[in-house]
Amino acid sequence: MDTTHDRRTSLSCDECRRRKLKCDRVRPQCGTCALSESECVFPGDSRKRGPKKGQLQALRARIRTLEQQLAAKDATWNMTYDFQDSTAAEPDEFSQCIQPNVNVFEPESMETLIFGIASSTSWPKNGMTPLDPALGAESHDSHISSTLSSLSLSALVQADLEQLFFDRVYQSAPIIHKARYITLMEQEDPLPACVCLRLAIRTSAAAFSARYHDIGERLYLETLQSLESLESNEHTLPWGAKNIQIEHIQSWLLLAVYEHMRMDKSQASSATSRALRLVQRCRLGDLDASDCLIQVGSHTTTATEEDFAVMEEKRRTFWLAFCFDRLLNTRDDLNWALPEEMVGFQHGHSLFSPGHFQGASLMYDLQIRMRVPASEASFQHSQDTNMPLLSEVMGEGNDDSLSPFATCVALMALYGCCATHRRLVSIAGGSGNESTKFWMRHNWLMSAIEKQRRLLQAPESTPNIFGDDPMLAFTHFFVPTLILHLVETADLWQWHSAEQEELRSVYKQQAYIAAKDRTRVAESLLCFSGFKVHPFLPTVLVRFFDFSGKRRIEMSDPDATSESRRNIRAMTKVLSLLRDIHRSAKEIPDDVLDGLETTLL
């Protein structure tokens, strides 16, 4: 064996360095290693390390894509390769088990329709692009592209899902400007946040469809993976917190719609929490204060420089997050992630301040920062409309009618006040001074809610009071629910004068009227498509059953017994119709629903 003495380096081999011996540096094996029959490795000759982080995952994604392409071209081809990695097992299982039950397209089957993949020269230009040839590239563009490719939907299914979103989901989550969305998606290389938004739109649409119900969970996992990848890349950049795109927040909110519709209660608030954190990080609540800096599209501008459509889309995104924050806590005494102080809502009375009960006599002095959403026509047609601030909407002198979404925002703000009002009951004592403050707050809230009820009131002869608008139906149902919430709070107060007891009786009469209004809405819902019902309507219905079971305020008046029975029957029928569509409708067991109907016979 030829040996050479390497005089170019003074470094010993690894074995001699480990044993702290003098090395003669003879190649390919030094004398010490030859005697001990050890492997002689010099610095610079070390074996190359394994693949970099992300390379194996990208390789698996490419293999899955190739397998699906082969399966689409040859129906007899069988995917038999099984990854041992546990992280890849779940997506493979989903890719093999998705078999839609509906077969409405002839002669091709639904399976061929959904998983048909175009040839390499005719990939659709709407985000379904091939993987980057550079396997080790770790930019979020290539990573999200690989995510999209692992679930290959045909162009027809993609278009159908997006149309379903605007037909069924948009009315409950009106945050997308359709023309701007189409423009963003027609870009040759859309931004990662825009790609995530498109996935989230398809995922939320699947929750409102019987045809695509089977692929909803798969779409959810794909969207979640894309958003996680986007955020993991942002966290590596010190300037990432300043470049939150509005499409990023919208993606989490639409994913929250799917979670609330399909996921268990323990998982139903995950996406909403992520969206709320992003809203806080980018200070989206300061939008109308002209000091919010947020990236939109491919450039960053101040809020005053943007056109109405972009500004309105941001407002709507914030208000939807605000509504979700309130609605997720209708049954839990949790703190708000977006308190009223953030949106600039000033309570009409200093009695809402907990500090007031500690002897402080200060008024809220908040800068009004946010305007309520404009009408749908103004938003979609980009017609600049100067909407009032939330505090102006809540004012006593403002009786202007608002869009259903703006009305929903006002009701959510009122619900936050009602929840704070109830929490202060446990803080305050039972003295006469505290009782006066309690009833002052109570009267102000009841007046504000009654004003919203009057604005929404429809003629008695109207057979369908909300047409085909799920947001309008939800607001019609939520107003009487707020009245019942206040009546329940009044029932919790222990110290009452004779005058206050009389006022309390008046509120109970208002609760009876509210129950009649809610019965009317519920009976109209029976003619409403279950796939167009607001995602949080079943949650409010469940809250009604909690109220009825604990207090039975509606049933306490003998004259209201007949109306109460009609009310509960209508609620029961609506919940029964929604149990197969909305997860929250299943929170009341079947035996409880049956028992309610039996007791009212």
From Swiss-Prot:
CDD domains: fungal_TF_MHR, GAL4. Induction: Expression is induced during the early biotrophic stage of development. One of its GO terms (cellular component) is nucleus. Residues 13-40 bind DNA. GO terms for molecular function: DNA binding; DNA-binding transcription factor activity, RNA polymerase II-specific; zinc ion binding. It is found in: Nucleus. Keywords: DNA-binding, Metal-binding, Nucleus, Transcription, Transcription regulation, Virulence, Zinc. Its main location: nucleus. InterPro entries: TF_fung (IPR050815), Transcription_factor_dom_fun (IPR007219), Zn2-C6_fun-type_DNA-bd_sf (IPR036864), Zn2Cys6_DnaBD (IPR001138). This is Abscisic acid cluster transcription factor abl7. It comes from Leptosphaeria maculans (strain JN3 / isolate v23.1.3 / race Av1-4-5-6-7-8).
